[in-house]
Amino acid sequence: DDPTSTFTCPGGSDYK
């Protein structure tokens, strides 16, 4: 997955 198009929620789960 491209880290530039992915962000981490405060819960710790990664979403596109």
From Swiss-Prot:
Keyword Secreted: yes
This protein's GO CC annotations: extracellular region
Residue ranges of coiled coil: none
Top-level taxon in the UniProt lineage: Eukaryota
Subcellular location: Secreted; Secreted, Cell wall
Keyword list, A-Z: Cell wall, Disulfide bond, Secreted
Family statement drawn from the similarity comment of this UniProt entry: Belongs to the thaumatin family.
Protein name from the UniProt record: Thaumatin-like protein 1
Species this protein is from: Taxus baccata
